[in-house]
């Protein structure tokens, strides 16, 4: 292998071969030169020569990527460009940007240039962040408070006098919807504005509709309560003689006891015209059956007081204490046909 074609260019003081012993060629000041690169070096020296021999080639291992912050810290002030630094200081950057923009810039301690890196942002917020909480414009809080006060403000309620209410009620009795001319005339008489009069009529119409609905509900309830009110029904307490004379003790065992009138005045089932073959208890006892019962009994069911020409009226002479009832009480177990039915 030809050593003349193995290595790229190198920088040396003078052309001259040297022994390929793995040692570095001496530099210009007698110090060892830099390690040979696999890529072409920039032309810095006056002479360019080739390495007469090549050592063992090693694979190129790229360095791991660094974050921008570390890269900027390692870079330092930066390369020179036309006699000045490429990275500007914070003061120069602020001066240039303030000329380009019309709005105020942030304080200097809030931002750092590329030379400082983002290390300033890792510390305490400092006074610069506190300045961000200041209002953008001094008049903004005042306008917000003014709008808040307007929303809280309520209009004053109009207090009408007695004369004003009388005049308004007179017109309302005539018409519920007065026209503009009537409202203006009423406003002149009552010393009010037309808008106040219009609002009063709106509220008065709403109150009137509410009362109408409530009145209809009450009218619908009154006939029902009047027709079915138990307190106004007639009571049979006005006939104590009938109850005392026809009431039998429960322990007497009389067959006619359950069929007689109860103390509450409500007839038992056997009092109906169809519960006995003789038609009624009175007919069974020999008393002529009345054509109609007492009106107090049938008034609960809505029947008319009289169904015929005669009405049942108990006598005060004690006619029901006849020998037939006495015989029934004395001989309850004897058949009815053997009893003496004398009146």
UniProtKB/Swiss-Prot annotation:
GO terms for cellular component: chromatin; nucleus. InterPro entries: HD, Homeobox_CS, Homeodomain-like_sf, Paired_Homeobox_TFs. Residues 153-212 bind DNA. It comes from the Eukaryota. Residues 1-104 are annotated as: Disordered. The keyword DNA-binding applies. Coiled coil: none annotated. One of its GO terms (molecular function) is RNA polymerase II transcription regulatory region sequence-specific DNA binding. It is found in: Nucleus. Keywords: Developmental protein, Disease variant, DNA-binding, Homeobox, Nucleus, Transcription, Transcription regulation. It is linked to Frontonasal dysplasia 1: The term frontonasal dysplasia describes an array of abnormalities affecting the eyes, forehead and nose and linked to midfacial dysraphia. The clinical picture is highly variable. Major findings include true ocular hypertelorism; broadening of the nasal root; median facial cleft affecting the nose and/or upper lip and palate; unilateral or bilateral clefting of the alae nasi; lack of formation of the nasal tip; anterior cranium bifidum occultum; a V-shaped or widow's peak frontal hairline. Transcriptional regulator with a possible role in patterning of mesoderm during development. This is Homeobox protein aristaless-like 3. The gene is ALX3.
